[in-house]
């Protein structure tokens, strides 16, 4: 795998002035990458081993914010033993086996079991109280009821694609972003959309919802979040759709030359994330 490093102007200025070392990274973003996350898991392992993902001299934690499978990677990095958690996640994901045409109910049940296996309850407490890393999980809430059956989901998804293609604001007619994090009042920036607490009681549902690809999963309800049906966080935040912090340096490992805001935008070559988002 070939790695290409790119830096925005503010990030580059800081790198030249201070270098890159422990306490210099303010956030790591885990975008929605589909199965490609398996390759990025090895990079996550290396970042953890390097010591880059540690709090700065003022005690400000590194933000780990992810959507879809990126949220699962970030959750593994928030555990007390990230290498072991990443290994469990990779192994459990690869072992998944389905009939040629599984129902959304079957897929949802399987991944609910997977996430509870990878992140058992005793681990959840540390994930939410980690003194070095602050976990944030992005999910998308459907505006109105979201069907459980594939045909109804795909119909609504196609409508959302059409309205988003006409104008980026059209996405809000179908989906609303929600960020779940422990102690929301300590998150450095107020993201657009809703913010809800991430707790041991809703952690597994939040992670399941963040990876619930429309058409393949049933919608998920999340206790403590605004009432509604939740699904894949990559719908609203595919690569990077909003600032996650006001400090450099933000690491955004992803798989292509473009940075798209929403899942729909990845299919629109003229629609890229704001250049300002990439400055840090």
Predicted feature residues:
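Patatin-like phospholipase
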Residues: 1-63, 76-280
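Catalytic nucleophile serine of serine hydrolases
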Residues: 68
């Amino acid at each position: 795998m070939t790695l290409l490093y790119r830096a925005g102007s503010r990030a580059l200025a800081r790198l030249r002035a201070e270098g890159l070392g422990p306490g210099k990274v303010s956030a790591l973003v885990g975008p929605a990458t589909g199965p490609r996350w398996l390759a990025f898991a090895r990079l996550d392992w290396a970042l953890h081993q390097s010591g880059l993902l540690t709090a700065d001299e003022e005690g400000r934690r590194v933000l780990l914010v992810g959507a879809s499978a990126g949220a699962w990677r970030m959750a593994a990095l928030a555990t007390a033993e990230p290498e072991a958690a990443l290994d469990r996640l990779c192994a459990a994901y690869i072992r998944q086996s389905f009939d040629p045409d599984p129902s959304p109910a079957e897929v949802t049940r399987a991944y609910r079991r997977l996430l509870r296996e990878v992140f058992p309850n005793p681990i959840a407490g540390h994930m939410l109280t980690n003194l070095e890393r602050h976990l944030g999980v992005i999910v998308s809430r459907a505006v109105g009821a979201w069907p459980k059956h594939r045909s109804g989901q795909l119909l609504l998804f196609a409508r959302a694609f059409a309205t988003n293609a006409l104008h980026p604001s059209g996405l809000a007619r179908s989906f609303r972003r929600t960020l779940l994090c422990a102690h929301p009042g300590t998150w450095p920036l107020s993201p657009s959309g809703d913010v809800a607490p991430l707790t041991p009681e809703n952690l597994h549902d939040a992670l399941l919802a963040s990876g619930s690809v429309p058409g393949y999963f049933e919608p998920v309800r999340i206790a403590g979040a605004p009432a509604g049906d939740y699904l894949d966080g990559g719908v609203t935040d595919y690569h990077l759709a909003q600032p996650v912090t006001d400090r450099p340096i933000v690491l955004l490992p992803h798989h292509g030359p473009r940075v798209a805001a929403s899942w729909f935008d990845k299919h629109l070559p003229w629609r890229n994330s704001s250049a300002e988002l990439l400055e840090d």
